[in-house]
Structure formats: C-alpha cells, structure tokens
Amino acid sequence: NVGAYIGEEKVLRFPERSDNLFLLEYHASAIEIAQRLEALWALQEGRECVVVSSARALLKRLAPARELLAKPLMLEAERDYGSSPTSDVSGYEDVIEQLVKRGYENTGKLEGPGSFSAQGGTIDVFPGNLPYPVRLDFFGDELEEIRRFLPSTGQTISSLKAVEVYPVREFEVTPKGKAHARKKLARPAETNQVLRELLVSLEDDSIECPDALMPFIYEKTESVGDYLSSKALTVLVEPRSLVDDAIHSLNKLAKKAEGTSVTVESLYLSANGLNFGTNTRATYVSIMRIGVELDGELVVKRVDVAGDPEKLFGRLRSLVDAGFTVVFSVPHFRARNEMKLSLVDLGIPIKEVLDVFGSS
C-alpha cells in the first residue's frame, strides 16, 4: 500500500472505464470519470503525488491535453467573484455554466454524484471526486460559504474554505468540435446507420453524446503519456505483463464491439501503442537466475504473519536474531508509540526515523 508510506492524500488512482463505450447511449460513472480526470490533472500540473494505474486503463484514447478538460472548478468561500474573478468564474451564473461545461446535470434535486441544483442564490452540487455534496451560498456574486451537508435532511456537517469540483465528462462538445465531427461523419453516415445515429446525437442538445463521438470531435486524440509533465517519473512494473494485460483487454473489447460499427481502434490504443511519456522512466522486472554467481545479495523478506500480535512479535524476534533489519512504516502517532513501547518491552532493539529533517 503506497499510501502507508507517503500518505493516502498523495496517492491517486487512474481506473479503467467500466462502462461499454461501444454503445450509443452514455452510461459512464461520474465517480469513475472524476477519479480519472483528477489523476490526469495532477500529472498535467506536475503535482507531487503517485498515480497508480493498469495497462487496461491506459488503453483508452483521450482528448488532447491542451484542451485542459481535466481542470477542476476551484471555488473559495468568502470571495467576491464580481470584484475578484478567476479565469473561469466572475459570478454566480458562471458557476452554473462551468458545472454544465464539466458534465454536471441540473436535476432540480440532487441525484447523486454528477448532479447539481440551483435555487435562488444557492447551488447544491455533488462532485464526482467527493463522497459528499456541497452547498454554495451566494450573496450576489460573492460566495459567502461552502458547506458540506446531508442531502437527505439538508443538515450542515461542516464548513469548507474551498472546494475543487472535477469534471465528469472526458470530452467537451464545442461549436468547433461539432463542425469537425459533422465534416468527418457526413459522407460515411449516408451508408451507415450507427454513424447516422451518432450524427443525430451530436445535434440533439437534450441527450448526452456517447464516447463513440469523441474521435470525430477532435482532429487527433491523445493518451495518458501526453499529459505527463517533464518532471514526472514513469515507473513500469513487469513491462511484459503490462503488454500481455493490454492484449487480453483488447481481445475482450473486440467482442464488445462486434456488430456496433464502432471500431476498437477509434476508442483505444493498440498494445504496442501504449504511451508512457518521454520523461524519466524506471523499470522493474523479475530476474531469473540461470547459473550466475552474484557478487553480493540483499535478501528482502516479508514478515508474513496475520492476526495474532504474539505471532508478529515472535516473527520479528526471529528475523532480528538472524541479522535482518525490519522496517515498519507507522504514520499514525498513537499507533507508532504503542508499537515502540511493545518492542521495548520485548527487548527488540529499535531505531525511530521520522520524516522530519534532522530528527530520529
């Protein structure tokens, strides 16, 4: 668990899309999309964090990074956006416009992640990236308060200084994108029923455009590797397995695509086309020994115990007596102190190293 070493708040996941992208209806999970876009924005901005993903998740084609579609709507309490606007917001109405732009649906009453409602000077929104909804209380164009609340009762749980609302759509249908899609679809749609339906959904603002339209909206699609900042480090664990996993996933996708007239290639990269970026890279592979003598060896073992504390401490004693160094990462202060006291009582030598320079 990477979060145990660097803190859960610094670990983000870029999950695989679980919905069927070959369908002409839009069935994406707002939580899943927001999670993916939060990870992409962190990579694009060069944030200090670790993004964990799989080969299957990296196969999906994305909108060009320059479109900044992963950018969150950032709001601060006690800020008058009329006199102190941002690039996205200069008042109450802009917040509504920006939510719609990011894929949020005005449902009149909250219907879970990806929905919002606006009444009077109050906007209730359920961000896809948060496990709770927030209430934005405006007075004119001043955002007086941001409150976390219970949607069932409206009861306030706590006030927040700021909130980031991540998009719940991976592409945006702009007038320019519409024109580009019309041009690419017009002729083939004359003889293809599915493409005709895509063209209809493009023109109908009352329905969500399916992901199958995304390749037609942009001149060129990109992938996760194109979102990486120059300072990013890409870590590949067992590259051969990553490629095998991608091939297996593409075979399953090909079965889903059968009879839809939407090609796998239009929505996904090939296994050989996986893009890990042009930045610094670290690769971890298993080494098989075949009659080779090693100059030196560092043996790493797992404690390999579960449940009973006595088993844990007994195993620790045997490892220490055998000359091993055992590393514990205990972020929680009270748990760390309890562990120290137990080890001292059992006569097991310890050394504490804190994540503060010069402290030990």
Predicted regions and their residues:
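Conserved beta-alpha structural segments and adjacent helices that either
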Residues: 1-360
